[in-house]
Structure formats: C-alpha cells, structure tokens
Amino acid sequence: INSICLLPSDGGVCRGRFTNYYYNSRTRRCETFRYGGCGGNANNFHTLRQCQATCYSS
C-alpha cells in the first residue's frame, strides 16, 4: 500500500468546509472527512475515485 494512505485524516488549519476523501487504514476503505482548505497531509483526495486509484491494491 502507498505510504500516503497510512497517514491519518487531517482537516488542516483553515476553516473551510470541504468534503474530501481519505484512506482509512483501519477499515481499509476510502471515507469522507471535512477539510478546511489548507494544511493537512497527502492522504487527502478531491474524489472517491482518486482515493481508490491511489490506495486500493490492484
């Protein structure tokens, strides 16, 4: 699995209200989380498809 996908969800430091996706390594699924718009880490995807393409093994 890509090491990015092992990072915890991180909403960042800004106060926006964006619904993005992250890979939850406990459930082994891409799930939604609230992203503030800046900061955070690389386990942060705009779409479910991007998350799945990066984190699901083929």
Swiss-Prot record:
Keywords: Disulfide bond, Nematocyst, Protease inhibitor, Secreted, Serine protease inhibitor
Marked site (Reactive bond) residue numbers: 15-16
Compartment(s) of residence: Secreted; Nematocyst
Residue ranges occupied by any BPTI/Kunitz inhibitor domain in the UniProt entry: 5-55
GO molecular function, one term: serine-type endopeptidase inhibitor activity
Pfam families: Kunitz_BPTI (PF00014)
Family annotation (SUPFAM superfamilies): BPTI-like
Disulphides: 5-55, 14-38, 30-51
GO CC terms in record: extracellular space; nematocyst
Physiological role: Serine protease inhibitor. Shows activity on trypsin and also shows a weak inhibition against alpha-chymotrypsin.
Family stated for the protein in its record: Belongs to the venom Kunitz-type family. Sea anemone type 2 potassium channel toxin subfamily.
Record's protein name: PI-actitoxin-Axm2b
Lineage: Eukaryota, Metazoa, Cnidaria, Anthozoa, Hexacorallia
